[in-house]
Amino acid sequence: MFEEPEWVEAAPAIVGLRPVTTQVQAATAPPVKGRKRRHLLATLRALEAASLSQQCPSLPGSDSEEEEEVGRKKRHFQRSSLANVSKEVGKKRKGKCQKQAPFISDSEGKEVERTCHRQAPPLGGISAGEEKGKRKCQEYSYLHPTQSLNSVDQTVHNSRTSTATLDPPKSSRESASPNSSHTLSRKQWRNRQKNKRRHKNKFRPLETQDQVPLKASIEETEVPPAPKSDSQETRAGALRARMTQRLDGARFRYLNEQLYSGPSSAAQCLFQEDPEAFLLYHRGFQRQVKKWPLHPVDRIAKDLRQKPASLVVADFGCGDCRLASSVRNPVHCFDLAALDPRVTVCDMAQVPLEDESVDVAVFCLSLMGTNIRDFLEEANRVLKPGGLLKVAEVSSRFEDIRTFLGAVTKLGFKVIYKDLTNSHFFLFDFEKTGPPRVGPKAQLSGLKLQPCLYKHR
């Protein structure tokens, strides 16, 4: 009775969910009549739209099913190959992580797995979320270097395997962002740990009261080192003493040269202006004489002790009054400056003694200056007739001993004893025979002695 519409014949195709082109339906769709027909037509169109969204459109023909099957196999093969590649990369990374860090606990590993699963990249490559997740994993490995990241790397690779595309897998350096920190080698990790320990020790807090007694007891057993301050002060004091000694030696040489190269009056003025200069000269003189095998004052004192103690002695150039301290005789001490209360300060060419008032006159290393004749004439004046003149002088000052002895005899003396055996000084004994036999204007070249100058060192 009624003609059946064309959509009844097309129903089996809908049940099979076969792809139907929109152009054919648009061309063959008849005008819809009735409420029931409109409902069926809407259902048909909804099913067609759902099938079109899930399946890619293919050309009509008998080869569409074969092409779909080939595409499905191809995609399955690509996914399986990508899974194998990602597993190999995961194993390599797992081995590296096992070398770099020890074991990690299960709870912490699960938390890191959840974090990495959340950051898994979508299809089509590595996204910003994957980079962020990998950065978190690397920061976790840096903060906990004693724990491994085996489970983290495995979960990240599994998520990549499930969502991988046809693109080849990228290396870790290419996939990581430039800001993310690189995985540390074993040597770098050790160096970083050492730097951390050094930084801790630098800012270590002060020791508690309980630790101080323990440390003190340990230090008591050890031998305390010598304080540096004392050694430095000792060295500084030794250096100052050495420099002072050198300066004193230089000044002594200068004063000695002045005494031998000028008259006694100039030397007296020099020491009156600078009394410390005489003290310095005397110290230098004593330092030089100490090196001699025999002091000439000791030899003269030995001779005087063999004579009567009643003899009056005049010591010209007494110094520190060593001769007066060595004999029992009364001694008149004369010098350019006073180092002892017994010393009378004066010029040896003019001593405050009466004529013919002494029995012995002594010149012990004191014939200094250019006016030696004045000294010997003054000794002749104060000596009693037959008095004794003793002269001890440095051996190197004599050029011709006979000439010197001849000149002394012209001044009213005669030689009674001479000792030339000592290597450092000569000793002569003269007896007064009378007043000088020559006038004051007569030249006595034999009385000129060489100055006793010390070498510069």
UniProtKB/Swiss-Prot annotation:
Keywords: Chromatin regulator, Methyltransferase, Nucleus, Phosphoprotein, Repressor, rRNA processing, S-adenosyl-L-methionine, Transcription, Transcription regulation, Transferase. It is found in: Nucleus, Nucleolus. Component of the eNoSC complex, composed of SIRT1, SUV39H1 and RRP8. The keyword Cell membrane does not apply. GO terms for molecular function: methylated histone binding; methyltransferase activity. The gene is Rrp8. GO terms for cellular component: chromatin silencing complex; eNoSc complex; nucleolus; rDNA heterochromatin. This is Ribosomal RNA-processing protein 8. Residues 184-203 have a biased composition (Basic residues). The keyword Nucleus applies. It is an enzyme of class 2 (transferase). S-adenosyl-L-methionine binds at residues 282, 317, 335, 347-348, 364. Residues 148-165, 174-183 have a biased composition (Polar residues).
